[in-house]
Curated annotation (Swiss-Prot), chain A:
Name used for this protein in its record: ATP synthase epsilon chain, chloroplastic
Stated family: Belongs to the ATPase epsilon chain family.
Location of this chain's protein in the cell: Plastid, Chloroplast thylakoid membrane
Native organism taxonomy: Eukaryota, Viridiplantae, Streptophyta, Embryophyta, Tracheophyta
One Pfam entry name: ATP-synt_DE_N
Protein source organism: Coffea arabica
Amino acid sequence: MTLNLCVLTPNRIVWDSEVKEIILPTNSGQIGVLPNHAPIATAVDIGILRIRLNGQWLTMALMGGFAKIGSNEIIVLVNDAEKGSDIDPQEAQQTLEIAEANLKKAEGKRQTIEANLALRRARTRVEAINAV
Amino acid sequence: MSCSNLTMWVSSKTSLSDSTALSFRSSITPVQLPSNNSTTANPSRPSSVTPIHCGLRELRDRIVTVKNTQKITEAMKLVAAAKVRRAQEAVVNARPFSESLVEVLYNINEQLQTDDIDVPLTKVRPVKKVGLVVVTGDRGLCGGFNNAIIKKAEARIAELKGLGLDYTIISVGKKGNSYFIRRPYIPVDRFLDGTSLPTAKEAQAIADDVFSLFISEEVDKVELLYTKFVSLVKAEPVIHTLLPLSPKGEICDINGNCVDAAEDEFFRLTTKEGKLTVERDIMRTKTTEFSAILQFEQDPVQILDALLPLYLNSQILRSLQESLASELAARMTAMSNATDNANELKKSLSIVYNRERQAKITGEILEIVAGANALT
């Protein structure tokens, strides 16, 4: 049996093809999905999606969302997804530094919420590059 | 030589009928500057419309100006038309996402109907302050597009004031920004710039802002004001409630009509027996079944928590896209009208110009004949 992965963002289809195995960053920890997985619905955290294609591992930074695993059909709905190879390392590192600085400066409940989210996104992007 | 010619010309003009009074007036001005004329009159002899006749030259200049303007408006129209197509493509690209999302949301809602769930984004609080997200365009020259949405916002503000509610504005788009900056008495939470093509990132920025405003309980209700794209010639400003999301409301048919995902559903803030209530009208449409056996990895609340921000995002993105499409369509119509007007103006100006030119030629012939007659 083959496993089909479909990663959708509001803008475009990021990934729509066959994979061997994926590791999905869910809210309750990472789960590996192989063919013939039981149908589940899960929330996807901000984190790294690992995809195995013929013995090769690819990474993708996911910005939080939702995944539905059906009969060998995975649909991942996320706000934004970027392939690790498409991220500019320098730019990602800079964004991370800015986000860290912003969190330190943040005052009040609202700014802290915003800064925390931004920091987590930035960190994930950097990790997606380095994880390869 | 040229000076005597001039006086001759002026005298011959006076002998003409009243209809040329205007051109006579303008042709008299060069007489006051004879030095200027004597230099230009001789080299430009072959071209019939010499600088002496300012009326003609002005007309010609105006025709050229109108022609240039027409070229610009025509180009803008074509650009807008091309961009409308791109905007439509963006909507089409967003469709698979919103379709799957609505499908999943619908089914999860179905399975959760019985449970008593409590998700922050769906919490309906007594409304004290309302956040208004106003989506305008970045540029003008698009007819009444920006005006219409700003008027709608003003009307809504007046309405909220009438209800004794506080409000704050999140302005998206340069036109709205400059409008609200000029009016400091309107509280604005944040100014955001639109870009040429709305992306998920932009929607995310707005969603983040809205999200934190709502979660930190600064506002108790968020409304989105944008221009709904109906057709190329019709667009209307609408108000759509973003938050609180109704956990039962996100329903639509999945047969491709998902761009209008929650359009069937309208929220109105009204007063009922002296209390503020939110009215909901929901039109239920059929949805196809999907795999019945679905386990939830986490708590249903957590899953909804993950889904609703996505939904919020896609709603905002869609409204941005619709707003852009409306703006471009409005610009297309406005520019097409401008081009038509320019054509008309050009036509009437050329008629006037040709008449004047003929009058001038007639005058010259009269002059020559009179001169010849005098000699014999």
